[in-house]
UniProtKB/Swiss-Prot annotation:
This is Zinc finger protein 81. InterPro entries: KRAB, KRAB_dom_sf, Znf_C2H2_sf, Znf_C2H2_type. The gene is ZNF81. It is linked to A chromosomal aberration involving ZNF81 is found in a severe intellectual disability patient. Translocation t(X;9)(p11.23;q34.3). There is a cross-link at K266 (Glycyl lysine isopeptide (Lys-Gly) (interchain with G-Cter in SUMO2)). Residues 21-92 form the KRAB domain. It comes from Homo sapiens (Human).
Length: 661
């Protein structure tokens, strides 16, 4: 029967079996665990390839209801194919093919260009092969019910495979047209050399290959390859033909410009049956096996002269070329921001709509992306699957472990072009660069204060709300931010990780160390515009400026007295509460202020750090030292307003005033 007699015309719906078979030929499924192993770049590549494949099917007259996975990908979601879903159904139910759990790709994505490490899984090979055999029997039963399906399937396969594409390689300005002789599998019957059996139709070979995969795993064609799909077999045959597809005269590149429909890999997981004859290297994935084979033969996949990456599918090459050329074709209509991939644009647009469809069942918090929700949920479970081999610290995400390990290696790839400072993460570099640009994107709606980081804004807003969610397990004290809690805990542990290289003094936080180091360099970066006085740190500078403004924002609720600094108010309030939290370990005497405790402890140690240069007399505290120096200078700063007499000390002036009263 001619192939076109029973073939569906463009726009005509085929049977459910036909639709499912054809769509599976361009589908790759991942389980939740496998999807989590892919990085963000691999996921975006998967999304773009799947969407492009679907559009190509529509362009050749293949009309079906939009699959659920396409709906998800258009929304920027990932394909969550869970094990145990999509059970076997009859042909009449519209299911014809392999369960997603049987079409899983072992390890990383098949379209990734570089060969990854081998993926070791605990899946039982024999149970998978048994299920594959059952699938073959199911397909045979469907075939007996629908004799016309074979010719329709053959027609559709030919139509897809013979679709010609014009590929423009912009680096050289040439159009490359694939030869019609490329489709070698359509010019002769599909044949298995190791069995000597020929088949008339693609589907017969598909069934036969799957059946014999369970029986003859170790039997080979040319070098140990077993196929479960006829398109995979045809693809493999081309590696032995030595055909040069389309050669570029100007650059000498040889490109196999095939259609962009990705191949559905169906190979038993965990079995190392793909062996390269050139190097003897064993691969667990077909895609990894084909990549080196194409390099050994005269056939070459798409290559880039600018880098070493190799791609076996054109859509991946197109996306990668955009990265090299910095082409951003997808533009946001709201803000004008441009993106290389459509999936990135879809994800970005949710920031304008404020749509957060993914909600945590534990706390009700919502997220833009599924990946963000999954990352958040680990905070509730406390699960930390990834452990650092150096220090044993655990992490809930592999990406967080990779970032952490750079602390041990000292690796800092991201360098600031302005000041040369290097960072372990690109996001940290971007945050740092806002210091140079002055950009403060995060603004408080209550007081208008702007911040460089969103985390700083969130911590600041808790000043207005009074929220202190982080509580110390040792003393019960609460803090508005996690970093403040971690810093506070060092009081209990005595940890001082930041050490001065000049004098060896240790500090609980980096900012105190930075301030201290300026005492060695003499640097005073903050200068008062009113009086010209300079300060080593911003906090003291801000405190000083309130002297000129007269502002005293901190008021005591008991007596109404106002103070410039919050710390002064806290110290003052201890007069009303009689609280003395600072206790001497030697004599158990208590003090309301920490500086008073330090001065007191010098009585026990005998330390007198303040020495008079005139007479050599030493003092335990600065105030007594300053009083003593007025004897040598003759300075009497405290004067009586009634008689004008001057005194060296304020206490003596107070005693003198009693004469006038």
């Amino acid at each position: 029967m001619p192939a076109n007699e029973d073939a569906p015309q463009p726009g005509e719906h085929g049977s459910a079996c036909e639709v499912s078979v054809s769509f599976e030929d361009v589908t790759v499924d991942f389980s939740r665990e496998e999807w989590q192993q892919l990085d963000s770049t691999q996921r975006r590549l998967y999304q773009d390839v799947m969407l492009e494949n679907y559009s190509h099917l529509l362009s050749v007259g293949f009309e079906v209801p939009k699959p659920e996975v396409i709906f998800k990908l258009e929304q920027g979601e990932g394909p969550w194919t869970l094990e145990g879903e999509a059970p076997h159904q009859s042909c009449s139910d519209g299911k014809f093919g392999i369960k997603p759990s049987q079409r899983r790709i072992s390890g990383k994505s098949t379209f990734h260009s570089e060969m990854e490490g081998e993926d070791t899984r605990d899946d039982s090979l024999y149970s998978i092969l048994e299920e594959l055999w059952q699938d073959a029997e199911q397909i045979k039963r469907c075939q007996e019910k629908h004799n016309k399906l074979l010719s329709r399937t053959t027609f559709l396969n030919k139509k897809i495979l013979n679709t010609e594409w014009d590929y423009e390689y912009k680096d050289f300005g040439k159009f490359v047209h694939p030869s019609p002789n490329l489709i070698l599998s359509q010019k002769r019957p599909h044949k298995r050399d190791s069995f000597g059996k020929s088949f008339k139709h693609n589907l017969d070979l598909h069934i036969h290959n799957k059946s014999n995969a369970a029986k003859n795993l170790d039997k080979t064609i040319g070098h140990g390859q077993v196929f479960t799909q006829n398109s995979s077999y045809s693809h493999h045959e081309n590696t032995h033909t030595g055909v040069k597809f389309c050669e570029r005269n100007q650059c000498g590149k040889v490109l196999s410009l095939k259609h962009s429909l990705s191949q559905n890999v169906k190979f038993p997981i965990g079995e190392k049956a793909n062996t390269c004859t050139e190097f003897g290297k064993i691969f667990t994935q077909r895609s990894h096996f084909f990549a080196p084979q194409k390099i050994h033969t005269v056939e070459k996949p798409h290559e880039l002269s600018k880098c070493v990456n190799v791609f076996t599918q054109k859509p991946l090459l197109s996306i990668y070329l955009r990265v090299h050329r910095d082409e951003k074709l997808y533009i946001c209509t709201k803000c004008g921001k441009a993106f290389i991939q459509n999936s990135e644009l879809i994800m970005h647009e949710k920031t304008h709509t404020r749509e957060k469809p993914y909600k945590c069942n534990e706390c009700g918090k919502s997220f833009f992306q599924v990946s963000s929700l999954l990352r958040h949920q680990t905070t509730h479970t406390g699960e930390k699957l990834f452990e650092c081999s150096e220090c044993g610290k655990g992490f809930s995400l592999n990406s967080a472990l990779n970032i952490h390990q750079k602390i041990h290696t000292g690796e800092r790839h991201h360098k600031c072009s302005e000041c040369g400072k290097a960072f372990t993460q690109k996001s940290t570099l971007r945050m740092h660069q806002r210091i140079h640009t002055g950009e403060r994107s995060y603004i408080c709606t209550q007081c208008g204060q702007a911040f460089i980081q969103k985390a700083h804004l969130i911590a600041h807003q808790r000043i207005h709300t009074g929220e202190k969610p982080y509580e110390c397990s040792d003393c019960g004290k609460s803090f508005p931010s996690k970093s403040q809690l971690q810093m506070h805990k060092r009081i209990h542990t005595g940890e001082k990780p930041y050490i001065c290289t000049e004098c060896g003094k240790a500090f609980t936080n980096r900012s105190n160390l930075n301030t201290h180091q300026k005492s060695h360099t003499g640097e005073k970066s903050y200068i008062c515009a009113e009086c010209g006085k300079a300060f080593t740190d911003r906090s003291n500078f801000n405190k000083h400026q309130t002297i000129h403004t007269g502002e005293k924002p901190y008021v005591c609720a008991d007596c109404g007295r106002a103070f410039i600094q919050k710390s002064e108010l806290i110290t003052h309030q201890r007069i009303h509460t009689t609280e003395k939290p600072y206790k001497c370990p030697d004599c158990e005497k208590s003090f309301s202020k920490k500086p008073h405790l330090k001065v007191h402890q010098r009585i026990h140690t005998g330390e007198k750090p303040y020495i008079c240069a005139e007479c050599g007399k030493a003092f335990t505290d600065r105030s007594n030292f300053n009083k003593h120096q007025t004897i040598h200078t003759g300075d009497k700063p405290y004067k009586c307003s009634d008689c004008g007499k001057g005194f060296t000390q304020k206490s003596v002036l107070s005693m003198h005033r009693n004469i006038h009263t």
